[in-house]
Amino acid sequence: MGTRFLLALCLVLLVLGFEVQGTQLPKQDEPPSPALLSQVQESLSSYWESAKAAAQKLYEKTYLPAVDEKLRDLYSKSTAAMSTYTGIFTDQVLSVLKGEE
C-alpha cells in the first residue's frame, strides 16, 4: 500500500471517528416531497447514516487508547506542518506578485 492510500484511509477514518463521537441531534420530521433532489438527498443521507453506524460499531469494537492518541498526535503535527508550509507558500506567492521594488 502506498503512503497516499494510508494517509487517505487515516483521514477518512478520522473524519468518521469524529462524526461517530459527535453529539447526536434529534432529527426533525420533514413533509415528504416527490422532488428528485430530495430523494437523492434522502438516499445519500441514509447511506451516510449506515456508514456512520458501521464506523461506530467498528470504533467500539477496535478502540485502542494508544492508537487514538497517536492518531490525534499525528493529526495535530500534520496540521501544524501544513499551516507552516501554507504560510511559506503564501509568502512566496506574494513576493512573486509584488515583484522586486
Swiss-Prot record:
Its main location: secreted. Residues 66-74 are annotated as: Lipid binding. Keywords: Chylomicron, Glycoprotein, HDL, LDL, Lipid degradation, Lipid metabolism, Lipid transport, Secreted, Sialic acid, Signal, Transport, VLDL. GO terms for molecular function: lipase inhibitor activity; lipid binding; lipoprotein lipase activator activity; phospholipase activator activity; phospholipase binding. Residues 78-101 are annotated as: Lipoprotein lipase cofactor. GO terms for biological process: cholesterol efflux; chylomicron remnant clearance; chylomicron remodeling; high-density lipoprotein particle clearance; lipid catabolic process; negative regulation of cholesterol transport; negative regulation of lipid metabolic process; negative regulation of receptor-mediated endocytosis. Proapolipoprotein C-II is synthesized as a sialic acid containing glycoprotein which is subsequently desialylated prior to its proteolytic processing. InterPro entries: Apo-CII, ApoC-II_dom_sf. GO terms for cellular component: chylomicron; intermediate-density lipoprotein particle; low-density lipoprotein particle; spherical high-density lipoprotein particle; very-low-density lipoprotein particle. Residues 1-17 form the signal peptide. Disulfide bonds: none annotated. The keyword Phosphoprotein does not apply. It is found in: Secreted. The keyword Cytoplasm does not apply. Belongs to the apolipoprotein C2 family. PANTHER family: APOLIPOPROTEIN C-II (PTHR16566:SF0). Component of chylomicrons, very low-density lipoproteins (VLDL), low-density lipoproteins (LDL), and high-density lipoproteins (HDL) in plasma. Plays an important role in lipoprotein metabolism as an activator of lipoprotein lipase. Both proapolipoprotein C-II and apolipoprotein C-II can activate lipoprotein lipase. This is Apolipoprotein C-II. It comes from Chlorocebus sabaeus.
